[in-house]
Amino acid sequence: MAKFVSIITLLFVALVLFAAFEAPTMVEAQKLCERSSGTWSGVCGNNNACKNQCINLEGARHGSCNYIFPYHRCICYFPC
């Protein structure tokens, strides 16, 4: 009986060690830096148009209209 308990204990320890080493690693979220659009002209009033322009023309991850004194501007977000 003692041999059976030691084998079960050994298997349990091996399973715990295996689970510890096989845990998925989390990738750190990529930080985004914002920059005024270089291709947008005028006041930004359409978030979707700004987003499409940032992605398609400037290669950004996304874009949005943000208020930066004195008016709304199209801001593009790029990986830092």
Swiss-Prot record:
GO cellular component: extracellular region
Tree of life domain: Eukaryota
Keywords tagged on the record: Antimicrobial, Disulfide bond, Fungicide, Plant defense, Pyrrolidone carboxylic acid, Secreted, Signal
Leader sequence residues: 1-29
Matching CDD domains: Knot1 (cd00107)
SMART domains in alphabetical order: Knot1
Keyword Disulfide bond: yes
InterPro entries in the record: Defensin_plant, Scorpion_toxin-like, Scorpion_toxin-like_sf
Disulfide bridge partners, by residue number: C33-C80, C44-C65, C50-C74, C54-C76
Cellular localisation: Secreted
One GO BP annotation of this record: defense response to fungus
Residues recorded as bearing Pyrrolidone carboxylic acid in the entry: Q30
Protein task: Possesses antifungal activity sensitive to inorganic cations.
Family of this protein: Belongs to the DEFL family.
Name this polypeptide is given: Defensin-like protein 4
UniProt source species: Raphanus sativus
